């Protein structure tokens, strides 16, 4: 685990970078539906001084993730390249007091002098994933589309079928 002082990074306008694998990111590993999920992630956090009177940084991620295609079940490599600007508050209350319309493109996060980089990167990757990752040009596996329980659906009975007979009896 790598921890950084996010406020010092911002103030000094320095840069931290590193590499993460799937074993560093347990929540992402659970989300990648595969027997052997993989992740090769390079990240860089660059302090950008104060913006809107708050500590700020730019997180750059270059990741290659391997999971299974939701349609055909074959191995699927997903590439995620993104830059996300962040503003850091010192408390949750301070973050909640910021007007929503002033967020702009910046993500607002509660910072720390012991900020968990792996969790930060993992959260951004999870937000970038499709719910059902799939190849753009694959065909669905017909067997996976078949219902596991091919039980016959019982014929529905019309609830009003006996209404006419009931009305005749009561008249």
Residue ranges: model-predicted function:
Residues 1-66:
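A positional/architectural concept
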Residues 18, 47-49, 73, 104, ...:
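Residue-identity detector for glycine
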